[in-house]
């Protein structure tokens, strides 16, 4: 198609005339530049527009060219518009540089017949595609792909030979040339169509050249086989009752199967790995990419009649750890047989549970954890005369009825009724004066003159302890030693704080609940008994 030529006449429209002027003015100057460079000449171009505006171009210097023009007296060529028109008419209207009159583009009968023929061919092609796919569907454009694949969902019992005739046409006319090997081997998109009476399996939009169980698993077209189509024999009852399954299966990048697994475990492992992909569907196809499967042979008894697994079978599969084996990019390998592969039984994994260590909660919160896991809440340890009952389902707590703290000696008198077991029973023990006397064995009047390195004096004159590490924490004889004098010390003559009372009450509860906890603990959970080193690390 050549350029549209216009008639050389004055342009009446103001806007069109201005646009044409600017365009052709630049064209004339460009031609002058090309002529000056190519032919080594001097050019001076002077243009006055219709609005009396001056535009000039000079290849070198305009004044020098004009001076040279005025001083030139020899005969020379001088042309006007009349001379140009005469020259163009002499050369003919077919000259490449000469314009011609504008011709009207009318629709001739020949052109109209040509367009009608193109439309008819397009309609015939669309009708052939609809007849080839059985008339039940329309061509469907796959996203992110360079080819169009007609997909139909036939009604059960209404398909016939026309379904089988669709695959050669699809493989020859509707599929673009094969993509590069890097795109194919990296794991592309596979479209698996399961009609009610036949199975058409295509990977990356191309049919397999041979059986997938033998040789290379990479799909590709072959000279002799244009499609891979296998017919599954079914009873008339199963044909009417079974609906067609149409799925787009995207094989994920899976890791190789460990070498110590058997053939059924390989199938179950690959099925489970595919069920963990982003396709959330209750029907899972068993056309699964399984690496290193060519060395196994399956018999007729290894396959079930149905080719899908329900959601209960998927949920029964045990979860494998994702980091067992490294990931690798494998090509798609589909298992095609007269019947689909089976849904194998899951592999049971037993993990031995180690027993938990006994709880050791020595905080002065008034709550104690029993060996059976229930918590019994005791009364306030700082109250002078109170009874505490155990929490629901737990062991009983012990109340400190009479707690007396002396100024110069830390001695505790614990006595009163036993705690009532809540829920499951288990009452506490009665406190007596002997237990209180044992708590004050290590207490002495000179304790208050000792200082601890981690303490800092408070504003009231007390030494506020900084919690440190107690090497006797958690042992059975810890309650026999009483509270650690390094934890809470007062200056001589200073009144004792409430923390002494709480620590003494907790020590009584620890001592009285220790026999009850020892009876419930087994040989494995019981802590080790060691002889207490009373003299080590304690000041006198």
UniProtKB/Swiss-Prot annotation:
Q: In this entry, which stretches build a coiled coil? A: none
The name of this protein is: Myocyte-specific enhancer factor 2
Q: Which gene encodes it?
A: Mef2
Residue ranges of the annotated DNA-binding region, renumbered to this chain: 58-86
Please list the residue ranges that the record marks as compositionally biased, kind Low complexity.
Answer: 207-217, 370-389, 509-520
Which tissues is it found in, per the record?
A: Expressed in all presumptive mesoderm prior to the splitting process that generates the somatic and visceral/ heart mesoderm. After the subdivision, it is found in both the somatic and the visceral/heart mesoderm.
The GO annotation for biological process reads: anterior midgut development; antimicrobial humoral response; carbohydrate storage; cell differentiation; heart development; larval somatic muscle development; lipid storage; locomotor rhythm
Q: Where does it live in the cell?
A: Nucleus
Family matches, as PROSITE patterns = MADS_BOX_1, MADS_BOX_2
Q: What function does the entry list?
A: Transcription factor that could be a key player in early mesoderm differentiation and may be required for subsequent cell fate specifications within the somatic and visceral/heart mesodermal layers. Essential for myoblast fusion and consequently muscle formation in adults. During embryonic and pupal development, binds to the enhancer of the myoblast fusion gene sing and activates its transcription.
Q: Per UniProt, which keywords does this protein have?
A: Activator, Developmental protein, Differentiation, DNA-binding, Myogenesis, Nucleus, Phosphoprotein, Transcription, Transcription regulation
